[in-house]
């Protein structure tokens, strides 16, 4: 499923299926006339470029890390080799449960390993408590939050764009619907197709997690350090959080990610909630990338019970190792899809600002921050958009702080 793409709001996803053309760096090494193997004192063969040699060394290092985590999984199991491999297969089966042919067909591979790729992250409002509740009996759980992430292993950079769940989208034969209805209409595969067309980019991977899974993952990491922007009092989200730098456990992290009514006085609560979700995800990424093999193994084990993804254990460890070195302070860009709220027949909808959306996605696809400025709400301390420019983000004292990038 190789593909190329054109970025644009509401653009149809049309992908070239031709075989990839090798990069120039894949060509044979070029030596000057008269040079002999002995005259080139390099640790790599004259038939291999230095870039390829370096890439191979990094690949070997990554394989060692993957092996270390797999060994850690064996230690966790404390069983024979056969039992350990069966255990890893069980984890893979848990991770891929519900990943059918339709879903894999909706995903589009990158041309080369290591290329930047898009991943759709979905948080559903399901939990064991809700499943057993009469209030939610028979309901299809909705994608309560969606983040379109661009991940670039080569430049160690991640861009997260939150998608407003109430965005009104034309879903063809299904009519005009809120974005979060896509999951209840056609599951993850349909949601991927809708978001891909809406954003004008191919989506290569996806992950879906519910409330319980999120809490378990954070707890498996031993909690995550987060600078909570403001005091949270939101019973609907689960309770109270103090403001300030602190280590959040799974329950506390979920409160921050769900808190919406705590921001009623500031305007669109969903926008602030999405910003906090990106804040927590950045903290999770920082913790995972600095984890030892045992902790990473425990996290994958915990995740596998609640997360659904096209990745397997090896994929997850390989991606984590390739992203080691990511500076989570400056290497993570973030923003939210630009929309305008409108009340229609008693229901609130978000209408995308198409020109701004197209410009944002063009910047994202070029590896640039989605916005040209940081946006920080000084009243709540919430970072609504980040360009990775931490130094400039505090240079303005207006109600919304900005820093041009």
Question: Which stretches of residues belong to each language-model region?
Answer:
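N-terminal targeting leaders characterized by basic, low-complexity, disordered sequences
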Residues: 1-51
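Entry/capping segment at the start of metal-dependent catalytic domains
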Residues: 50-155
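Extracytoplasmic
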Residues: 114-117, 141-146, 155-158, 163, ...
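Second-shell loop/turn segments in exported
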Residues: 132-137, 177-185, 200-205, 243, ...
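Extracytoplasmic/secreted envelope proteins and their assembly/folding machinery
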Residues: 143-145, 176, 188-196, 211-215, ...
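Amphipathic, coiled-coil-like alpha-helical scaffolding segments used for oligomerization/assembly
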Residues: 180-242
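Flexible, polar/acidic helix-loop-strand segments at domain edges
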Residues: 219-295
């Amino acid at each position: 499923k190789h593909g190329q793409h054109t970025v644009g709001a509401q653009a149809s996803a049309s992908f070239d299926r031709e075989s990839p053309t090798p990069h120039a760096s894949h060509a044979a090494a070029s030596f000057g006339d008269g040079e002999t193997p002995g005259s080139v004192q390099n640790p790599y063969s004259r038939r291999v470029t230095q870039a390829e040699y370096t890439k191979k060394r990094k690949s070997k290092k990554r394989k060692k890390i993957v092996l270390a985590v797999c060994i850690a999984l064996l230690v966790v199991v404390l069983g024979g080799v056969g039992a350990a491999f069966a255990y890893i297969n069980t984890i893979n089966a848990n991770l891929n449960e519900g990943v059918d042919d339709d879903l894999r067909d909706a995903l589009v591979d990158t041309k080369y390993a290591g290329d930047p790729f898009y991943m759709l992250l979905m948080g559903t409002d399901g939990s064991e408590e809700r499943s057993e509740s009469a209030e939610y009996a028979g309901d299809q759980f909705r994608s309560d939050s969606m983040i379109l992430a661009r991940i670039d292993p080569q430049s160690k950079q991640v861009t997260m764009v939150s998608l407003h769940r109430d965005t009104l989208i034309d879903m063809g034969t299904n009519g005009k619907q809120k974005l979060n209805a896509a999951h209840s209409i056609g599951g993850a595969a349909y949601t991927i197709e809708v978001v891909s067309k809406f954003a004008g980019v191919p989506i290569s991977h996806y992950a879906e997690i519910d409330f319980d899974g999120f809490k378990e993952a954070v707890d498996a990491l031993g909690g995550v350090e987060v600078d909570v922007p403001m005091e949270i009092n939101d019973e609907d989200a689960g309770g109270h959080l103090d403001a300030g730098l602190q280590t959040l456990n799974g329950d506390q992290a979920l409160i921050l990610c769900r808190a919406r009514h705590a921001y009623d006085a500031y305007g669109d609560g969903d926008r602030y909630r999405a910003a906090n979700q990106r804040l927590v995800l950045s903290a999770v990424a920082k913790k995972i990338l600095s984890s030892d093999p045992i902790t990473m193994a425990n996290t994958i084990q915990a995740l596998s019970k609640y997360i659904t993804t096209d990745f397997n254990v090896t994929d997850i460890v390989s991606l984590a190792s390739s992203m080691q070195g990511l500076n989570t302070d400056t290497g993570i860009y973030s923003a939210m899809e630009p929309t305008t709220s409108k009340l229609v027949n008693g229901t609130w909808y978000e209408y995308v600002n198409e020109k701004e959306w197209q410009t944002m996605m063009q910047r994202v696809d070029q590896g640039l921050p989605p916005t040209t400025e940081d946006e920080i709400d000084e009243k709540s301390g919430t970072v609504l958009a980040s360009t990775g420019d931490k130094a400039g983000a505090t240079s303005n004292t207006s109600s919304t702080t900005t820093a041009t990038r």
